[in-house]
Amino acid sequence: MIDKRRPQRDLPKINERIRFPEIRVIDSDGSQVGVITPKEALSLAQEKELDLVLVSETAKPPVCRIMDYGKYKFEQEKKAREAKKKQHTADVKEVKMRYKIGESDYNVRVNQAKRFLKSGDKVKATVTFRGREIQHANLAQELLERMAKDLEELAEIQQAPKREGRNMMMFLTPKK
């Protein structure tokens, strides 16, 4: 029975919902049955206690396969879940420091950046200035270039060191 509240076009084309004058049928073992009417194909599928599923609507004639639809649907959902799991959106992680940073603090920032890059995230390295420190922008640029050099095996520079207001920043992206 077809539910009248749900539009028919949203439902998958299986069994009686396949409305074409003739279709190419592939058996459950992968062999071609040939070009036959949907009624004949449906009777073949019912003999094997399987479903007739439309695989390619655009082909001439449309291609249908005799298979267990429940199992097929489960496999498709499983593939979609796996693809979603593997998909990682690259966030931008920020590493902040001052141009007068101590050596051990600098190493901590470099290690943070390495961790971010290894997890596939982009890194925004920022040097902030206070008061008259802005006169030493060249030291901040040297610091950012040193950081880029220390991270060159993991990252490539997306945006070179650039001053914006009271900050100087540089963007690094992980190497593929």
UniProtKB/Swiss-Prot annotation:
Its main location: cytoplasm. Keywords: Cytoplasm, Initiation factor, Protein biosynthesis. InterPro entries: T_IF-3_C_sf (IPR036788), T_IF-3_N_sf (IPR036787), Translation_initiation_fac3_CS (IPR019813), Translation_initiation_fac_3 (IPR001288), Translation_initiation_fac_3_C (IPR019815), Translation_initiation_fac_3_N (IPR019814). One of its GO terms (cellular component) is cytosol. GO terms for biological process: ribosome disassembly. PROSITE patterns: IF3. IF-3 binds to the 30S ribosomal subunit and shifts the equilibrium between 70S ribosomes and their 50S and 30S subunits in favor of the free subunits, thus enhancing the availability of 30S subunits on which protein synthesis initiation begins. Belongs to the IF-3 family. This is Translation initiation factor IF-3. The lineage of its organism: Bacteria, Bacillati, Cyanobacteriota, Cyanophyceae, Oscillatoriophycideae.
